[in-house]
């Protein structure tokens, strides 16, 4: 942000190409592979897809993902504000309603830094399509997507690509979920359940979003779980998703 780069959850005043030109000129935070940090890498991949296919990213999403999976309520912006949940954020005094330009510090265990929020971006059809953080949807659609990944990609992905989702690619510096976790191409990957002190089994893939959602799928247990809240950051990395996780496994174990 010090060089004016914009992310997928803040007010967008540039095109994707303009934003990535700024990114290309920004100095590296560290040498590649030295440490984990958030980036616009997935936005870059979205731009690569546009160049390779000659199609805009929203059209790619519809043709490659939404239509095959039957996702009817997920897009890069919401056409109707009435369909959006009101976003809140945690404070010591209880949840407070978000406002434009709100800055929140990320938890230290998530590499620190801060998030600049723009709830109005979800209604801005002119905002650039952010592959990393720029979409809205509902629980049914997210669950369909997560379940498709758990079951092997449902013909959207090649078997070797699916295998990359389930392989750790970064060392201990990327243990954003704590000990026992690695990082695959799809998010945090559980490597050692005992070290992580979780009922989930090795191979579980999980991630979340700063507005307050979390998801995971456990291939061994044949479980896909989606937790959507409207509260940052509790719904992403607070006690609530941990309690839901534990309740799900307690019910499964009977």
Task: Give the ranges of each region predicted by the language model.
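Short, surface-exposed charged micro-motifs
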Residues: 186, 214-216
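Short, surface-exposed loop or secondary-structure junction motifs
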Residues: 1-199
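Generic C-terminus detector
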Residues: 232-254
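Extracellular/periplasmic catalytic domains that process cell-envelope and extracellular macromolecules
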Residues: 30, 217-219
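Short, well-ordered beta-strand elements
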Residues: 215, 222-231
């Amino acid at each position: 942000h010090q060089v004016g780069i914009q992310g997928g959850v803040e007010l967008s005043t540039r095109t994707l190409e303009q934003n990535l030109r700024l990114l290309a000129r920004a100095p590296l935070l560290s040498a590649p592979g030295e440490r984990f940090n958030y980036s616009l890498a997935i936005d870059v991949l979205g731009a690569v897809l546009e160049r390779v296919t000659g199609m805009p990213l929203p059209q790619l999403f519809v043709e490659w993902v939404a239509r095959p999976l039957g996702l009817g309520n997920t897009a890069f912006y919401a056409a109707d504000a009435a369909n959006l949940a009101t976003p809140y954020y945690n404070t010591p005094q209880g949840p407070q309603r978000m406002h434009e330009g709100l800055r929140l510090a990320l938890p230290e265990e998530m590499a620190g830094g801060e998030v600049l929020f723009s709830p109005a971006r979800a209604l801005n059809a002119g905002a650039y399509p952010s592959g990393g953080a720029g979409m809205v949807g509902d629980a049914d659609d997210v669950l369909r997507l997560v379940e498709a990944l758990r079951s092997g990609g449902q013909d959207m992905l090649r078997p070797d690509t699916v295998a990359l989702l389930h392989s750790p690619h970064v060392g201990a510096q990327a243990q954003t979920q704590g000990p026992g976790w690695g990082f695959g191409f799809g998010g945090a990957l559980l490597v050692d359940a005992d070290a992580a002190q979780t009922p989930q089994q090795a191979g579980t893939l999980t991630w979340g979003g700063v507005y307050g959602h979390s998801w995971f799928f456990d291939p061994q247990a044949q479980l896909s779980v989606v937790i959507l809240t409207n509260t940052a950051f509790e719904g992403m990395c607070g006690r609530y998703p941990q309690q839901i996780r534990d309740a799900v496994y307690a019910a499964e174990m009977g």
